[in-house]
């Protein structure tokens, strides 16, 4: 009986510990105007540190990192909605006002989601290579109901050997940046990620459709895109995806891939600084 009580106690402690895991981790730096830096899928908040160093004027950075990535304990699914919920709670608790949101990829999705809910607290938004509805571009015509956690592709990814997953990570990293040293870094982030978060979290992203929220966002928005495969394909996609935004500027980088901060850093800094100075 005593042994049973001890085991039960350990189970409760373990369960409570998992339940209390935070969906986000935030590192602060600097002072003055709050800038919430939202990285993309698998990326840590530190991916934005060089951008922060190159911002003109005084800013207080909030570098966000996500559960399940970069050594942060995973949380139960659904994942994306938990990130958004905790970010909104963080902003309210910290009483942040006149916030600049800067988000890459999935971070751009979170920026849209946050601005739609807390519009009176947001001053400007910078979205870097993010789509409001990925599945429309990647898998047009596929209904949202088709995206479930339990599906053959997800199960294959969850059960993949380390070698097979590393090969997949290598190919994906090569498609995200032209910088070979950064490809190695991206591959490392993917391999070190909690596998279930990596697989199921991406399913969460495929379910997203933020287009209905765009009309509620009144603040200026800068949308920066990578010219891959080419500008003639990319620009119409961005224009269509963000047609609901009333106050937007869209610019496409001269070259590079998804991680614009790696492939075109000076162009990125110039675009953001010009936008924030208006």
Model-derived features with residue positions:
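Bacterial Sec-dependent N-terminal signal peptides
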Residues: 1-24, 220
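Conserved HGGG/HGGXW glycine-rich cap/lid loop of the alpha/beta-hydrolase fold
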Residues: 28-73
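Active-site loop/oxyanion-hole signature of alpha/beta-hydrolase fold enzymes
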Residues: 60-102, 106
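Conserved hydrolase catalytic core segment
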Residues: 97-139
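Flexible "cap/lid" loop of the alpha/beta hydrolase fold
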Residues: 125-160
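Conserved alpha/beta-hydrolase catalytic His-Asp/Glu region
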Residues: 136, 141-142, 158-215
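Conserved loop-alpha-helix segment in the C-terminal half of the alpha/beta-hydrolase fold
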Residues: 221-257
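Catalytic histidine-centered segment of alpha/beta-hydrolase-like enzymes
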Residues: 256-265, 269
